[in-house]
Amino acid sequence: MNKIHLCTLAVLTSLSFSSLAKDCDANLLPSWKDSGSKTAIVNFVEQSTDSSKATFIPVSDRIAVFDNDGTLWSEKPIYFQIAFALDQVKALAKMHPEWKTQEPFKSVIENDLEKVFAGGKESLLQIMKVTHSGMTVEEYQQSVEQWLAAAKDKRFGKAYNDLTFKPMREMLTYLQENNFKTYIVSGGGVDFMRVWAPEAYNIPEEQIIGSALKYEYSFNDGQPKVMKLGELLTLDDKEVKVENIQYIIGKKPVLAVGNSDGDQAMMQWATSQPNSMAMIVHHTDEAREWKYDRQSDVGRLDKALDEANARDNWQLIDMKNDWCAVY
């Protein structure tokens, strides 16, 4: 390489690093560019924690709720818990020879996902029931652990629990360091998330709220156990998120973060008071992750997108332009 090329490379490298330094502060939310989203987060936290300001929020009221799928980790091309369920059907197929001719299991075994999803919610519910019930909570969570240790996302070649968003992990840490109590309020299965989310997000099991099948307690031969049944207890989506927040947390959050219309209700609930904020992760980066919103079957963002554009205390996070890194 001649001197001219070396000089050119040095200049370009210098410009690249200087641009990175300008855009990404290594000391505060380092995976966030210096954009409106980062400013909104920092301003909200600083105003909430400064006791000399009217915007001060007592520690006991610093409640922040986060969706999980599409907000804290990816959700494409299918929800990761669905990927787990499909793999479990294949693993259990040896014990169920009747599935070879019985839908939707036949299509799962044959990897015909188009036909599986053509069956709609009823097909998915059948799949979820046979893979998520008829066992103790401990047995179920062990199966999730084993799956996470072996399964890989086909596009990125990573373990599914390595596909959490680095900027969002930093945001959670920043809030936690400023005495915000962070909760997950997700449509995902609560027992599924409690296996891996505490380590990923530093959020304890008791602060994870999600969908659940009914449980049954029994005490036989001196042994207590809790079984997972094949009947829905709660589907933690849309307005049910607000109802579960009230039932379980008992306080209105001051910050709600989501990515889809399924999160709109809890964002409305959180921002129906002064000194509050909602944030929406907008998937705009098809190169590093996925690009989707209004027309997506998974994580559709339509009505909430319109509301975000009309509300002063709702902030859109533009994944492509606001994040220095995704994973």
Regions found by a protein language model. Give the residues of each.
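C-terminal cap/substrate-recognition subdomain and adjoining C-terminal extension
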Residues: 21-32, 36-42, 46, 61, ...
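Bacterial N-terminal signal peptides that target proteins for export
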Residues: 1-7
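A metal-dependent, Asp-based hydrolase signature
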Residues: 78, 83-162, 166
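N-terminal signal peptide c-region/cleavage motif recognized by signal peptidases
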Residues: 16-18
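Short loop/turn motifs at secondary-structure junctions and domain boundaries
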Residues: 54-58
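Short, solvent-exposed loop/turn and secondary-structure capping segments
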Residues: 75-78, 83-86, 195-196, 269
